[in-house]
């Protein structure tokens, strides 16, 4: 199972939000490339980058920071989300060498767009599904919809998405541990990989996720825990690799 460090971008800086609130951001670094280097040096094999301004404005705002990381680490796969609402944006990111584009809110508002994107860029599209008590939330978590997360996940699987990034939003950025049951239920219902996000705080969470890797959980995104120190990234990835072999 891949442990994937998150670099959330706001106004050109690396930050973490609590519960998706733009005015509740902790700034961790103004040097994005140095932050990426820190995780690469600790053994990261992929980066998860989110353009937070882009997510709220509906178009890329921090693309330059993504491109700088891409240039500094040409062999490192990057997955990017936030503000991806049209095929042109996806094309620009992929041409720059980004590996995966993550469609979030637009996937729920306009599911046809996911099918279009998968057709145009097969193998490069992921969907980010945020859910609270099994129901999908959108618009920076401001709105909980009446869409069931498993039903939508199946639809996107049929469209050809590469993976689903699943966040239990009751827990993200709050250091409460992972919602194993909800993550497992989604993974078991689908055949494509699930990347767990939200609530990973320590090595125990990695141990818990490792028990459902066989159900289709291929990765876990970690943010606040590695920035605030409750999880050592290098130890976390080493443990994950060890448990994957077991």
Curated annotation (Swiss-Prot):
Keyword Hydrolase: no
EC number(s) stated in the UniProt entry for this protein: 5.3.1.16
Swiss-Prot/TrEMBL keywords: Amino-acid biosynthesis, Cytoplasm, Histidine biosynthesis, Isomerase
Entry keyword Membrane: no
Superkingdom classification of source: Bacteria
Enzyme class: isomerase
Biological processes per GO annotation: L-histidine biosynthetic process; L-tryptophan biosynthetic process; malate metabolic process
GO cellular component, one term: cytoplasm
Gene3D superfamilies the record matches: Aldolase class I (3.20.20.70)
InterPro entries referenced in this protein's UniProt entry, alphabetically: Aldolase_TIM (IPR013785), His_biosynth (IPR006062), HisA_bact_arch (IPR006063), Isoase_HisA-like (IPR044524), Isoase_HisA-like_bact (IPR023016), Malate_DH_AS (IPR001252), RibuloseP-bd_barrel (IPR011060)
Family: Belongs to the HisA/HisF family.
Name of the protein in question: 1-(5-phosphoribosyl)-5-[(5-phosphoribosylamino)methylideneamino] imidazole-4-carboxamide isomerase
């Amino acid at each position: 199972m891949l442990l994937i460090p998150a670099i959330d971008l706001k106004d050109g800086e690396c930050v973490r939000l609590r519960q998706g609130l733009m005015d509740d951001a902790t700034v961790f670094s103004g040097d994005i490339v140095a932050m990426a280097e820190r995780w690469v040096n600790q053994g990261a094999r992929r980066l998860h980058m989110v353009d937070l301004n882009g997510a709220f404005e509906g178009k890329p705002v921090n693309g330059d920071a993504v491109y700088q990381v891409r240039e500094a680490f040409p062999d490192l796969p990057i997955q990017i989300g936030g503000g991806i609402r049209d095929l042109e944006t996806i094309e620009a990111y992929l041409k720059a060498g980004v590996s995966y584009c993550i469609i979030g809110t637009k996937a729920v508002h306009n599911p046809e767009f996911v099918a279009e994107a998968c057709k145009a860029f097969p193998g490069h599209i992921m969907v980010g599904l945020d859910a609270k008590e099994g129901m999908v939330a959108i618009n920076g978590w401001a709105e909980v919809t009446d869409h069931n997360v498993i039903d939508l996940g199946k639809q996107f699987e049929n469209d050809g998405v590469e993976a689903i990034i699943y966040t239990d939003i009751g827990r993200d950025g709050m250091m409460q541990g992972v919602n194993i049951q909800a993550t497992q239920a989604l993974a078991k219902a689908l055949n494509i990989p699930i990347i767990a996000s939200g609530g990973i705080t320590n090595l125990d969470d990695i141990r818990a996720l490792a028990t459902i890797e066989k159900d289709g959980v291929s990765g876990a995104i970690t943010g606040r825990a590695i920035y605030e120190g409750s999880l050592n990234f290098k130890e976390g990835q080493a443990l994950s690799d060890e448990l994957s072999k077991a």
